[in-house]
Amino acid sequence: VLEANVQMTPVSSSAVVVDTDRYPNLDAVMAAMVEGDDRYRYSVAWVDCMRRGASMGRGILTRGDHLDDPTGKVVVPRSSKLSVPFRPPSGLLNRASISAFNEAWFRVAPKHEVGALHEIGAFFHPLDGVANWNRLYGPRGFVQWQCAVPDAAGDVIARAIERLSAEKVPSFLAVLKRFGPGNEGPMSFPMAGWTLALDLPVGPAALPRVLDELDELVAEAGGRIYLAKDARLAPRQLPRMYPRLGELLEQKAIVDPKGVLRSDLGERLGITTQATH
């Protein structure tokens, strides 16, 4: 890359003004996120994938914007950093332990808090406050799964969480966000609508099948999976989720006619093979 133009958002401070609310179920969380689209620059919710019935998908919604501080006098102290000192057994994160954690996490969050100041890094990357957090998943690790679906397919989010709960596939981290339009790139992931990101411990026998079912659900709704996190998507789903895949293959054939540029993801999804034919 010889030259790149990057569009930046000008800010006058390193703080974010944050409002936090707890909601009893997924419907209430999503309704609040839609209602606040015009009032908040950033909106993210933690949702509880372990609950069923009337409290399915209960969540903690945090919304905010950059603090306007042209004088630069406001200083937000950095949060103290915790650390996971050892790698626990893989079985530690199971349905029972994650349900207990989710209950505590939900209760500790404020029911309604307005105007709290958060350090910008802590707001955007809360897991960075816990060093070696990945050790919590034990030696078997975890699988990341993230989808984006159009506004009109918001019910896919509820159906995905229902499947996870019904199949007893636990998610230690489930994050729901609103997306604006994607860019003009043929493989752009965002689309105006919703994105759900999950961290799932490796272990449950049903996990591969459930994720395949969620992939199908997303594809049928006109959505897509985030390839930067993917490690197991079936190749047949790629052109359904990324209908402009052909444009990428055409460009790759021009700039890399001998197929020198390769990756494990490209090999698994057949991108490399298609581009060299």
Each PLM stretch: what is its role?
Residues V1-H277:
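Noncatalytic alpha-helical scaffold of FAD-dependent oxidoreductases
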